[in-house]
Amino acid sequence: MINFVPFFKRKNFDDGVDEPEEVKHFNSFGEGYDYYLNRYRETMAWWHKPEQAKFHIASDRITEVKPDMGPSFNMIRVKGLEDKNIIESKTLAETYVFNEADIDGPIISTGCDHIVNGNFNKWLDETDFDIAIPLRRQSKVNNALIIQKRRTTDTINFFNYRLEMFYKMKPDSRAWYGDQRSYENIFFEQGLLTKGKKGSGRLGLHNIMGCKILVIPYGGDILGTNVDGQYFFPHALFYDYKGDRKSKYKIGLDRARSRWQNTQ
């Protein structure tokens, strides 16, 4: 059973928690995150039978998401996020999901604004790794999705260390992209990235802290970008939309729907 686990915390801008400017534009593009989460679950179900995949939402203790079709969403409630900003909340929630959540099988931890464009089972069955992390242009981690194939003592230690790396950064530098930079700092430390050298990232399988870490390209047969990005792989399993790129979201959704319908 594959577990798709997006993180979503509904932001109350009157809660007194400081956020970077980027977060203040959270809902300025597209249809809104409730819509994206509903479509994300819908596209997952196109490609996976009920016994193959399950959809959860990792969140704080109060956020609710209403389904516009199908059953209620299964919420994974993470304590202690009320006084945390969005990126810190996401990082803490991801750590909890990978290390403690009561779910079995591979975990695909993601954001909200995604489209599933294929069945993950064959790739997971045929690919040897413990954790998969995307690298954009072999330079920067993009955690549109982080995949944990199996939970072990080593993977728990890895994600705890990643959380330590997050808190080693100054609050201002981790408030936006800190969730991604914490992975990058591990890559710098392990020699998978070289500071000041673009394109230095090493794709493929690496051993870090006893874990088989698979570095995959952001833009490829697993994780494709949006339709007007530098890459567009029609058969990629998963698509990511960020910021003003959401204006092309419905085009990508229609393409994914057509591809799925053509397989029926």
Where are these regions (language model features)?
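Short, polar loop motifs at secondary-structure junctions
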Residues: 58-65, 116-121, 219-222
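Catalytic core and acceptor-binding pocket of nucleotide-sugar-dependent glycosyltransferases
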Residues: 153-261
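Short, hydrophobic beta-strand segments that form beta-sheet elements in well-ordered domains
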Residues: 52-61, 106-108, 113, 131-132, ...
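GT-A fold catalytic core of metal-dependent nucleotide-sugar glycosyltransferases
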Residues: 75, 82, 86-140, 146-156
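N-terminal anchoring/stem segment of glycosyltransferases
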Residues: 1-85, 99-104, 153, 262-264
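A generic structural signal for well-ordered coil/turn residues at beta-strand boundaries
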Residues: 141-142, 230
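A structural signal for well-ordered alpha-helical segments within the folded catalytic domains
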Residues: 38-41, 88, 92, 177-185
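Short loop/helix-cap segments at secondary-structure boundaries that form the rim of catalytic
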Residues: 63-71, 122-127, 225-228
